[in-house]
Amino acid sequence: GFQEPELPQIEYLIKCLPEYVHFKQDREDGLRPNGQYLMIMWLKNKYELCDSGRFWLSPTPDEASFGWDGRCRRVTVWVKLRDKKSERTFYYFNTHLDHRGNEARQKGAEMNVKMMQRIAGKHAVIFHSGDMNSQRGTTTEAYLQPYDNWMKSARERAVESDQRATFDGFGKSQPRWLDHIFYRHAKAVKYATLDGKD
């Protein structure tokens, strides 16, 4: 799952990763052609797309809109994929919570859980990644609670994991752990933060 790529970056990824296919949605829904997107990519020889969709994190989720006290329009994209070998299906949701609005983060997280329950149901295998703009051990940890109540954290539950920060402003900011992966009805085998520093 990708948050914030713009069209030149998306075109680069598509060119460099021809074995993958993708589903994307710009958060402005075409209002700003050069704006930021949310995107999911998957191996086309391994998975088949069964369904896909998107919703905005706002009181009007079917249209590009600002949520509560959010600074930006925020959207969640999702796909339902079928493993071609095992024929098992799963859902993948990818989101980006607001970076300023506290109410927008709280209600955005609550809406994500509500929509996952509505779209996938309570018994499906679900993976959910995103820039949550929320960190454990700080006041923003409260915005992760809706996920904790219904899902498990891959970083905390994986057999093999790490504690590397997911954000450091390209070396210009204090390291922070703002990005998270949650899952349901699956097993976390490995969690790794790929920061290009190795």
What is each model feature region?
Residues 57-61, 98-99, 110-114, 147-149:
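Short, low-complexity, polar/charged sequence segments that are solvent-exposed and flexible
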Residues 46, 103, 107, 114-127, ...:
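Metal-dependent phosphoester-hydrolase catalytic domains
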Residues 3-5, 25-29, 43-44, 55, ...:
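Active-site-proximal beta-strand/loop segments in catalytic clefts of secreted hydrolases
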Residues 2-89, 193-196:
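Structured beta-strand-rich core segments of catalytic domains in phosphoester-bond hydrolases
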Residues 3-7, 34, 72, 102-109, ...:
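Solvent-exposed, acidic/flexible segments
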Residues 1-13, 41, 79, 91-95, ...:
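Active-site beta-strand/loop signature of hydrolases that rely on acidic residues for catalysis
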Residues 17-22, 86-91, 121-126, 149-151:
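Loop/turn elements at helix/coil->beta-strand transitions in domains of secreted/extracellular proteins
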Residues 47, 71-73, 80-106, 110, ...:
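Metal-dependent phosphoester/phosphodiester hydrolase catalytic core
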